[in-house]
Curated annotation (Swiss-Prot):
Name of the featured protein: Uncharacterized RNA methyltransferase OB0768
Domain TRAM residue range list: 7-65
Gene Ontology BP annotations: rRNA base methylation
Record lineage: Bacteria, Bacillati, Bacillota, Bacilli, Bacillales
Organism: Oceanobacillus iheyensis (strain DSM 14371 / CIP 107618 / JCM 11309 / KCTC 3954 / HTE831)
SUPFAM superfamilies from the UniProt entry: Nucleic acid-binding proteins (SSF50249), S-adenosyl-L-methionine-dependent methyltransferases (SSF53335)
NCBIfam families per record: rumA
Superkingdom to which the source organism belongs: Bacteria
Length: 459
């Protein structure tokens, strides 16, 4: 059978009317039924585009000129185009519609659960300046230290991108001042090609509610010339700085942080709150970057868990214990599991900070730990999972199914893997009751969800 040749060729130019959006936020137009995906174009817009890649079933294009614009188009607040904010040309209403549609679509096509209620997405009242953390590369140009995010799909630093409309405004003040200090005191930027130089990255973490600031300098060696003068100027300029840290990363790697961390000034941690709970945050802590929406997400997870005072709960992928402690406010006992030992140490400290003595944290892989707990007679009423983007391993899902909790609450940062895993849990004897999307990352194509499942009566 002859192969069907796509009706377009690379480098051809077309004027097209766009009709839809992909999950990534790319505009979709069709040429003789062949889909062409083009970034930064919206439905109902007409645009002149150049074909840049041709696959068998779809292609990609580049926007050359808009000839008709949508009422949903807005002027981007940032013109740097680092690739982090894929949707900043799109009205917030349309962003929410797109994300809602993505969740509906995977629930239908992947999970085959099109009858399950997907509630209207919970967006932000002020969808800007929400990120409480940045780790930004440092480079050199014409003998001057520069900082900025990498250009999309490259390691070229976009020079002196000191401000970002999704970063906490305190970060936007600290970064340019810090860059000026690096130049003032002659700090040499690291060059990843030659593996020479000193300063690799600058990380800034901010407590959204406490206003605490931590500054982390990631260096190639433990040497840090002029550090005392730099610290003096930083702490005088920003009294809310509570911690200045040096992290040493001597490897040729894209991983930002190395193994050795040393506090140069101040505290080991900064602190922030989610609801009534306080959390200690170290340079390496995984702490949700949008604490406002994290509270919304966790409140919904707690609602779906429907815990009473006699319930025993397992929190898999518990991290630094943030969800665990929310659950412990209602439950008789919470068991948290996490594979990263440092995260468990943070979790134990956070439990102590909040006076929680009904939480027990363990290091290990949940799929191996939970069967042992079951053998020891632990029968959880509720299991809460919050896995990485890849979703849950099949071994873990099978271990969870074998424990037969009354309810499962699945917190997800990837609707596609959520839908895949819901299908497995449905086939294992659980029923998906409802799904709640939450917009944790405005201006980006990411969407979080909380799903509630209950054990079917026949089980």
């Amino acid at each position: 059978m002859a192969k069907t040749k796509p009706p377009v060729n690379k480098n051809e130019i077309y004027t097209l009317t766009f009709e839809d959006l992909t999950h990534e936020g790319n505009g979709v137009a069709k040429i003789e039924g062949y889909p062409l995906f083009v970034p930064e174009v919206l439905p109902d817009e007409q645009a002149k585009v150049k074909v840049v890649k041709v696959n068998k079933n779809f292609g990609f294009g580049k926007l050359l000129e808009l000839t008709k614009t949508s009422s949903h188009r807005v002027e981007p607040t940032c013109h740097v185009h680092c690739g982090g904010c894929q949707l900043q040309h799109m009205s917030y209403d349309l962003q929410l519609q797109m994300k809602q549609g993505q969740v509906h679509n995977v629930m239908k096509k992947v999970a085959h659960l099109d009858q399950v209620p997907v509630h209207p997405i919970l967006g932000m009242e002020e969808p800007s300046h929400y990120r409480n953390k940045v780790q930004i590369p440092v480079g050199e140009k014409n003998g001057e230290v520069i900082v900025g995010f990498y250009q999309k799909r490259s390691h070229r630093i976009l020079q002196n991108q000191d401000t970002c409309h999704i970063q906490d405004e305190a970060i936007n003040e600290v970064l340019p001042f810090t860059r000026q200090l690096m130049n003032k005191y002659g700090i040499q930027a690291y060059d990843e090609k030659s593996h020479r130089g000193q300063l690799r990255h600058i990380m800034v973490r901010v407590g959204h509610y406490t206003k605490d600031i931590m500054i982390v300098f990631v260096t190639k060696t433990s040497k840090f010339p002029e550090k005392d003068r730099i610290i003096k100027e930083l702490t005088e300029q920003f009294p809310q700085v509570k911690s200045i840290v040096q992290n040493v990363n001597d490897q040729r790697t894209n991983v930002v942080l190395g193994k050795k961390t040393k506090v140069l000034w101040g505290e080991n941690y900064i602190y922030d709150k989610i609801g009534d709970l306080t959390f200690a945050i170290s340079p390496k802590s995984f702490f949700q970057v949008n604490p406002v929406q994290t509270k919304v997400l966790y409140d919904k997870a707690l609602e779906y868990a429907n815990i009473d005072k006699d319930d025993v709960v397992i929190d898999a992928y518990c991290g630094i214990g943030s969800i665990s402690l929310f659950l412990a406010q209602k439950a008789k006992k919470v068991y948290g599991i996490e594979v990263v030992p440092e995260a468990i140490e943070d979790a134990k400290m956070n439990a102590e900070i909040n006076g929680m003595n009904n939480v027990e944290f363990s290091v290990g892989q949940a799929e191996k730990v939970m069967p042992k707990w079951k053998e020891q007679g632990l029968d959880p009423d509720v299991i809460v999972v919050d896995p990485p983007r890849k979703g849950c391993d099949v071994d873990f899902l099978e271990a969870m199914i074998a424990m037969k909790p009354k309810r499962i609450v699945y917190v997800s940062c990837n609707p596609s893997t959520l839908a895949r895993d819901l299908r497995i849990l449905e086939d294992g004897g659980f029923e998906t009751k409802q799904v709640q999307p939450v917009d944790m990352f405005p201006s980006t194509n990411h969407v979080e969800c909380v799903a509630e499942l209950t054990l079917k009566l026949s089980n």
